[in-house]
Amino acid sequence: TGEEAGIYYIVMELVEGITLKEYIKMKGRLSVREATSIALQISAGLEAAHNNGIIHRDIKPQNIIISTDGKVKVADFGIARASSGNTINSSVMGSVHYSSPEQSRGGYSDQKSDIYSLGITMYEMLTGHVPFDGDTAVAVALKHLQEDLKGPKELIPEIPNSTNAIVLK
């Protein structure tokens, strides 16, 4: 970051590759091994953000980039907030398919909200689709609030119990 002649700027890394969403669409669904590897890299990125007091608030496959050399990067911190600051959602909220129940209610977002969204992302990697869908954003948000998440193992029986438990955590 810096300032030059009264103009502020941020220098960011250029990451060439594809989004995790595109990758899932190409493959249909990922193997447990591959999904776990990607989830671990996302977790490391979230840990770095959280350790620096930043909550992402919009973790989803569209905001995860897989570089051409296979590295996974968490991108688009556009609605991120400092965890020490006001993290009450106003009109800005993460994508409804990946939003935590707290975000769906318009309430407090913290590190747990990012972890919930990571769980939904893992579910999509393992099954090829999101667990809750609907005709409107409100319908999807209500499902996050009112319905229990079914484990990915119910759709893909070969998913290990341990992986299923992590997604449901």
What are these regions (language model features)?
Residues T1-A139, H144:
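Conserved ATP-binding/catalytic core of the eukaryotic-like protein kinase fold
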